[in-house]
Amino acid sequence: MTIVTEIGKILKTSKHLSELESEMMSLMSEVFTDSLAQCLERLDKELISDYLVQGWEIDRIESRQVTFLFGEVSFKRHRLRKEGEKSFLPLDKALGLEARQRYSPSFMEKVSLLATGMTFRQASASLELLTGRTMSHQTIQGITQRVAEAIGKSEVPPSEELRKPKVLYIEGDGVWIGSQSKGKHHEFKRGFIHEGVDRTGKRGQLINPVYFGCFGTSRDLFQEIGDYLQTHYDLRETIIIANSDGGSGYEASKFEEILGRYGSFNYCLDSYHVMRYITGKLGFDKGLQKSIRQAVKDYNKSELELLLDTAESCLEDDKQLEKLLAVKSYLLSHWEAIKPLKLRDLGVTDGVGVCESGHRFYTNRLKRQGRNWTKSGAESMVILMTAQRNGLFEVYYRNSYPFRTFSSEIKINMRKLLQKGQHDQHVIPSATIPLNGATSSPIGQMKKWI
C-alpha cells in the first residue's frame, strides 16, 4: 500500500484540518522511523560481512532505540566477537553512537535550547505539545547538563585576521543568583565587549558584541576576556573604553591588566550605579537628592561642591550627615571616572552602560519566580545561554564529541546496498487526445488545457 493511499484514508476519515494534521504527523513519523530502522538493519548486515571474512563471529543480536527529531527509531544490530579482541557493534562504531546514547545529538541540542527560555517543567510540557513525545523534566535537565559540558569543552577558534577597531568597549558586572543552600547565593560574573553602536533611527544595535560569563572569581572572568582579545584583536591603535560599577574585582586596573598593548585607555564609572548610590544614600532629602543628581548629569563640579557643602553645614542628624559625607567622598574621588563620554573628546558619545541592561537576558531564566540553583546547574545554564547569545551554540556543540564523522564504511557499504536494491524510477505517464473536429469544440478546448 502506497503512502498516497494512506494519506487518502486519513483524508477520508478526518473531520477537520486539525485531525488531518495530527494524523499526518503520526504517519510521517512512522514512515521515517520504520524506513530508517530497515535501512540501518540492512547496513548492519552489510557491515558485518567484511568482519566475518576476517575471522570475527556473531556474538548476539542486540536491540537499540534512538530518539530523533522525527521520532523514535528501534532497530537491531549484531555484536561481533573474536578471540583476544574486545567485542563490538560495527553499526554503532560506524555511526559514532556512544554506549547508552538514547537521543540523537540534534534532539539534545534542540531540547537544551528549549530549556534556556523556560523552566524544565515547561520545556517538558512544550515538547509533548509540539511533538507528542513525553519526557520528564529531570531528563531534560540531564540533557542540558550533558550538552553544556560538551559546549564548555569547545574552544573558540582564533581569528584568521585580527580585528583593528577604532574603539573597543569592555564592561563587567555581577548578578546574584539564588542558591539551593539555605542563606547562600551564587555570584554570576559577566562581561562583554563590543565595537560601538550602529544607530538606525532611535534604535541602536551593538557592533560585533561578544559575551562572557562564569561563576568563578572576577580574575577568571577577566582572564577569559583577555584570552579572547589576544586571539581576535590587535589593539595597538584602538581606544579602549571600560565601564563598570567600580566594585571589588571590577576596578579600572582589572580591565587595563588584560589588554597588552593598546592605543589609549579610558575608564567610565557606570552612570546607573552612580545615580542609584546617590538615591540610596540621600533618601532623607528628596530635593537635595534631585539637585545632586542633576549636577552629576551636567558634570558641574562647582555646583556639586556648593550643594554638598551647604547641606553639610545645615544637617544636624549624625546619621544623615554620615550618609552625605559618604556621597561627597564617593563622587569627588571618582569625579574623573564619572565624566560623560560626550565630554571626553574621543569621537564617541554613547556605548557604555549596556551590561546592566543586558542582565535581563539571564535573569529572566535564572532569577524569575524566586528560582534557586545548585552551582553546577547554574553554570550549565549560563554556558548554554552565553553560547546562544554569541550565536555559537550550534558551532560549539557540533565541534564536541556527539558529532563524530560517519565512518567511511557507511559510504562504501551503502553504495553496495543501493546497487543491490535499485528499483525502476517513477515515471509520470503521458498521453495525447486525438482531435477529429474543430479546436473550438469542447474536446478541442480540453486538449488546449492539457
Curated annotation (Swiss-Prot):
InterPro entries: UPF0236. Belongs to the UPF0236 family. This is UPF0236 protein in vanSb 3'region.
